[in-house]
């Protein structure tokens, strides 16, 4: 039996699958087109400031998934970290997600939880009974003032689309709290790897039986050299964009350095048109256990992803999902290839979900090998 496995991409998906299959006795080759592992989670020390830099933008690990949390803690020391996001709009600084402090500050009131909830309900547009767009959803639940201050312009900057063009599902879970909790996430486990994400991925992938080829693109014509291929690149690229290019948003970062503390917080969103960027990230605040005299910041801009750009956020509108379905159908007929991860399934995925799915995919492959069953092209439904 050919026990050689090819994995395309050395982000979390590829690294976790490589880890699991190598420990099960397979010989694994990982092909990574970039000069580094860890994908968009890549972190490195900034030479000038010494700050741990989230090279492709901020990543905070947060999860309720016990298996994913236990897995990452096996390969890195995690420091406690709580993401507390601020937002600038109408010339003031507010807390996000919208909470009791945000509501009271915005409206100049001193309401308690029940009063604030009733007040917010009174602001909602009751004429919208079944919201179908992002805009309708926001107007229905928070009213026009909060919608225009915090959601409308920011959404246009982030997605390049009007909120009236986006589905309501983006805002299904209304980010409003009627207390003073300013933790951006509500998950049980939250933290940051002490030595950065690339060190974590390196520890995951650095097991006997795994060889990593950096700066190397995998040729699909070589797939017959392997028992199986796990592909975490863009699904449309595997098929040479035969049905067209699946669109993404990409990010540009304007990097600047300063002495001391630039903004006093890791992330500040800019929700109105006073600034063209969506947010400023000050990286040293992601590692509060470290001390640095200087600081490095990113001003972040979102735009349509072009052919040579790094894809970040899939645009899963109706037209895009129709194109995705064509690729999914092609993938179902591709023997001995499984499509995984954010790009391989054309979905926005948090790190913990990526890791949990990679572990489940590894389990499925090992079970299929034991039972001589066919390994599917997907272990989740990318159309869901």
What are these regions (language model features)?
Residues 24, 216-326, 332:
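Mid-domain catalytic core of redox enzymes
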Residues 45, 282-384:
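Conserved flavin/dinucleotide-binding core of flavoenzymes
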Residues 82, 212-216, 341:
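Short loop/edge segments at beta-strand edges and connector loops
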Residues 90-228, 232, 239:
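Active-site/ligand-binding neighborhood in enzyme catalytic cores
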Residues 12-13, 35-37, 49, 101, ...:
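Short, solvent-exposed loop/turn segments at secondary-structure junctions
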Residues 22-47:
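Glycine-rich FAD pyrophosphate-binding loop
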Residues 3-30:
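N-terminal Rossmann-like FAD-binding beta1-loop-alpha1 element of flavoenzymes
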Residues 49-125:
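Dinucleotide-binding Rossmann-like beta1-alpha1 core, especially the glycine-rich loop
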């Amino acid at each position: 039996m050919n026990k050689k496995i090819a994995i395309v991409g050395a982000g979390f998906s590829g690294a976790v699958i490589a880890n699991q299959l190598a420990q099960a006795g397979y010989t694994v080759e990982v092909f990574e087109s970039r000069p580094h592992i860890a994908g968009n989670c890549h972190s490195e020390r900034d030479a000038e400031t010494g700050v741990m830099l989230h090279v492709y933008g901020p990543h905070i690990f947060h999860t309720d998934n016990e298996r994913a949390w236990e897995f990452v803690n096996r390969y890195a020391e995690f420091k406690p970290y709580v993401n507390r996001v601020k937002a600038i709009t109408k010339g003031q600084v507010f807390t996000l997600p919208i909470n009791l402090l945000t509501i009271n500050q915005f409206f100049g009131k001193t309401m308690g939880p029940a009063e604030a909830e009733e007040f917010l309900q009174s602001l909602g547009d009751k004429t919208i009974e079944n919201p179908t767009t992002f805009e309708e959803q926001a107007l229905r639940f928070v009213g026009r003032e909060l919608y225009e201050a915090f959601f409308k312009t920011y959404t246009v900057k982030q997605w390049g689309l009007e909120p009236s063009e986006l589905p309501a599902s983006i805002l299904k879970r209304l980010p409003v709290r009627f207390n003073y909790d300013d933790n951006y996430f509500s998950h049980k486990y939250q933290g940051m790897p002490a030595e950065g994400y690339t060190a974590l991925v390196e520890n995951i992938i650095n097991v006997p039986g795994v060889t990593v080829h950096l700066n190397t693109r995998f040729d699909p014509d070589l797939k017959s050299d392997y028992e199986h291929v796990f592909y975490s690149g863009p699904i449309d690229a595997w098929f040479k964009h035969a049905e067209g290019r699946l669109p993404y948003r990409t990010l540009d970062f304007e990097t600047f350095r300063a002495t001391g503390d630039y903004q006093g917080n890791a992330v500040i969103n800019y929700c109105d048109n006073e600034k063209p960027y969506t947010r400023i990230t000050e990286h040293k605040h992601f590692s509060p256990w470290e001390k640095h005299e200087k600081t490095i910041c990113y001003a972040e801009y979102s735009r349509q992803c072009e052919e040579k750009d790094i894809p970040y956020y899939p645009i899963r509108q109706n037209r895009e999902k129709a194109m995705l379905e064509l690729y999914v159908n092609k993938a179902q007929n591709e023997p001995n290839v499984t499509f995984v991860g954010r790009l391989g399934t054309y979905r926005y995925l948090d790190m913990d979900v990526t890791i949990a799915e990679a572990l489940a995919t590894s389990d499925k492959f090992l079970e299929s090998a034991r039972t001589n069953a066919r390994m599917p092209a997907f272990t989740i439904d990318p159309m869901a």
